[in-house]
Amino acid sequence: MFPMVTEFMNYGQQTVRAARYIGQGFIITLSHANRLPVTIQYPYEKLITSERFRGRIHFEFDKCIACEVCVRVCPIDLPVVDWKLETDIRKKRLLNYSIDFGICIFCGNCVEYCPTNCLSMTEEYELSTYDRHELNYNQIALGRLPMSIIDDYTIRTIFNLPEIKT
């Protein structure tokens, strides 16, 4: 009879422990019920990116002096800079500048180390295409300013997402 009583007490302790674990899980579930949703409905709602967001690179052709610092600091030697040396004035003249965003890792080194600030990061992050060759941007495509999300009246912009408290 004694082992039967201990088994019954063990069963009672296990039942209480299981109820406690279920209760803890239920409390955690209920604590998440009053939080705001973290996800957004993407094509119809867009987030306003932060000030230091690393999006598509914007290039200003007139400011570039063809020094190739951007190529030297790039971890994958990505920017292609074509220039011609003008012998009469002993300066380089930029002919072509291109970046392939299919390969770019958006590290921002080229923007940071450019001595003339002809490169800058934009807030544009929608670069997807059906053909990878369309991601190779020349100086004309790089010089195009992105359309602002705030100006598009068909898209609801979300300024702040609720922060997750840990």
Swiss-Prot record:
<keyword id="KW-0520">NAD</keyword>
<keyword id="KW-0934">Plastid</keyword>
<keyword id="KW-0408">Iron</keyword>
<dbReference type="GO" id="GO:0051539">
    <property type="term" value="F:4 iron, 4 sulfur cluster binding"/>
</dbReference>
<feature type="binding site">
    <location>
        <position position="114"/>
    </location>
    <ligand>
        <name>[4Fe-4S] cluster 1</name>
    </ligand>
</feature>
<dbReference type="GO" id="GO:0048038">
    <property type="term" value="F:quinone binding"/>
</dbReference>
<dbReference type="InterPro" id="IPR017900">
    <property type="entry name" value="4Fe4S_Fe_S_CS"/>
</dbReference>
<feature type="binding site">
    <location>
        <position position="70"/>
    </location>
    <ligand>
        <name>[4Fe-4S] cluster 1</name>
    </ligand>
</feature>
<dbReference type="GO" id="GO:0005506">
    <property type="term" value="F:iron ion binding"/>
</dbReference>
<comment type="similarity">
    <text>Belongs to the complex I 23 kDa subunit family.</text>
</comment>
<keyword id="KW-0479">Metal-binding</keyword>
<comment type="function">
    <text>NDH shuttles electrons from NAD(P)H:plastoquinone, via FMN and iron-sulfur (Fe-S) centers, to quinones in the photosynthetic chain and possibly in a chloroplast respiratory chain. The immediate electron acceptor for the enzyme in this species is believed to be plastoquinone. Couples the redox reaction to proton translocation, and thus conserves the redox energy in a proton gradient.</text>
</comment>
<keyword id="KW-0618">Plastoquinone</keyword>
<keyword id="KW-0793">Thylakoid</keyword>
<feature type="domain" description="4Fe-4S ferredoxin-type 1">
    <location>
        <begin position="55"/>
        <end position="84"/>
    </location>
</feature>
<keyword id="KW-0521">NADP</keyword>
<keyword id="KW-0677">Repeat</keyword>
<keyword id="KW-1278">Translocase</keyword>
<keyword id="KW-0874">Quinone</keyword>
<feature type="domain" description="4Fe-4S ferredoxin-type 2">
    <location>
        <begin position="95"/>
        <end position="124"/>
    </location>
</feature>
<keyword id="KW-0472">Membrane</keyword>
<dbReference type="GO" id="GO:0008137">
    <property type="term" value="F:NADH dehydrogenase (ubiquinone) activity"/>
</dbReference>
<comment type="subunit">
    <text>NDH is composed of at least 16 different subunits, 5 of which are encoded in the nucleus.</text>
</comment>
<dbReference type="InterPro" id="IPR004497">
    <property type="entry name" value="NDHI"/>
</dbReference>
<feature type="binding site">
    <location>
        <position position="74"/>
    </location>
    <ligand>
        <name>[4Fe-4S] cluster 2</name>
    </ligand>
</feature>
<keyword id="KW-0411">Iron-sulfur</keyword>
<dbReference type="Pfam" id="PF00037">
    <property type="entry name" value="Fer4"/>
</dbReference>
<dbReference type="GO" id="GO:0009535">
    <property type="term" value="C:chloroplast thylakoid membrane"/>
</dbReference>
<dbReference type="GO" id="GO:0019684">
    <property type="term" value="P:photosynthesis, light reaction"/>
</dbReference>
<keyword id="KW-0004">4Fe-4S</keyword>
<feature type="binding site">
    <location>
        <position position="104"/>
    </location>
    <ligand>
        <name>[4Fe-4S] cluster 2</name>
    </ligand>
</feature>
<protein>
    <recommendedName>
        <fullName>NAD(P)H-quinone oxidoreductase subunit I, chloroplastic</fullName>
        <ecNumber>7.1.1.-</ecNumber>
    </recommendedName>
</protein>
<feature type="binding site">
    <location>
        <position position="110"/>
    </location>
    <ligand>
        <name>[4Fe-4S] cluster 2</name>
    </ligand>
</feature>
<keyword id="KW-0150">Chloroplast</keyword>
<feature type="binding site">
    <location>
        <position position="107"/>
    </location>
    <ligand>
        <name>[4Fe-4S] cluster 2</name>
    </ligand>
</feature>
<dbReference type="InterPro" id="IPR017896">
    <property type="entry name" value="4Fe4S_Fe-S-bd"/>
</dbReference>
<dbReference type="InterPro" id="IPR010226">
    <property type="entry name" value="NADH_quinone_OxRdtase_chainI"/>
</dbReference>
<feature type="binding site">
    <location>
        <position position="67"/>
    </location>
    <ligand>
        <name>[4Fe-4S] cluster 1</name>
    </ligand>
</feature>
<feature type="binding site">
    <location>
        <position position="64"/>
    </location>
    <ligand>
        <name>[4Fe-4S] cluster 1</name>
    </ligand>
</feature>
